[in-house]
């Protein structure tokens, strides 16, 4: 089960299980909520194919589309790029039925649309009209595989969804019946995705150390690569129209000119980075990068990024936040102007803690007594019979390396020793 938390001005959004809560960051009151429908209505529906695929011409709506090709092999044979979504129940019972739960929640730039992806028994992309209506469901579209990242374009007209196999699909937010388009693919899981403000470039990062910049709409054409990381790239953030920040399991925070594929800054971190958030403090000049570490005595690092007039980037201030690391399993976080909200598991139950962004200490003012319990109750985390919350095992993100040379040298050593013993005998 996943927990998602984010801050989209002017509200904090938390998703867990089958519910999404919207919290006012000023008075910390829950003013809106979403609960997934008991049945997403996906039974018998297949994920749709790319628009350009000939077989997709007959698919006119999400209710009639089936898994088809999105391209052809060099010999002309059609490739099957999607599959039927796995069918399953919506309750977490002991009968082997997998529950459906919220995985990602993302606001559109104009704040009017909300994209929710689900995992488990029914994998889907749900599109809501968030304002001024009270989160009205517009469409439910099946996904072939669990989503790994979601991103709207700058004008909120479409949304990108990447899955655990590295494929990236574009879903139309205006023509809701239009089939998704397969834009690009990686050979490994994509952990984050960006779409430039001018919609000319899609930037993706994956488990294989790569940051790829793909031209749009001609996504068959790769514009550049940002290479240098030695482990998975867990997060990306757009800084300016030419610059991005990245965080990686190789214990580095980097800044790139993604147009040129050029590294401009490499800053060493105390531990592998598994989450990255960036806040703009001064337009195109000063930013605050927040990094969630993997298994470190300090859970979070806050870094002040500054850009000089001659395009030189530097880290001018660093603050490490313990967040009581070690006493619970931290899974996610978000920032507001004055607080850090951290989610995780304690005794296999969802936990939420709040810290002061200036001091890194637990927030002692402005957080009403009983507020955390109210939020956890609203998410259903404290309900009797609620399934245990076990965060994702991030150790699988790291590459498994095999030292065949050491094994060979050990065998050679034993063979020489045996030969010497035979001679002596």
Swiss-Prot record:
It is found in: Nucleus; Cytoplasm. SMART domains: WD40. Residues 88-102 have a biased composition (Low complexity). In testis, it is present at high level in hub cells, a niche for germline stem cells of testis. Ubiquitously expressed in all testicular cells throughout spermatogenesis. Ubiquitously expressed in all germline and somatic cells of the ovary. Keywords: Cytoplasm, Developmental protein, Differentiation, Nucleus, Oogenesis, Repeat, Spermatogenesis, tRNA processing, WD repeat. Required for the Mettl1-dependent formation of N(7)-methylguanine at position 46 (m7G46) in tRNA. In the Mettl1-wuho methyltransferase complex, it is required to stabilize and induce conformational changes of the catalytic subunit. Required for binding of nanos mRNA and repression of translation by the mei-P26-bgcn-bam-sxl complex. May cooperate with mei-P26 and nanos to derepress the BMP signaling pathway. May cooperate with mei-P26 to suppress expression of a subset of microRNAs. May cooperate with mei-P26 to regulate bam expression levels in germline cells during gametogenesis. This is tRNA (guanine-N(7)-)-methyltransferase non-catalytic subunit wuho. It comes from Drosophila yakuba. The lineage of its organism: Eukaryota, Metazoa, Ecdysozoa, Arthropoda, Hexapoda.
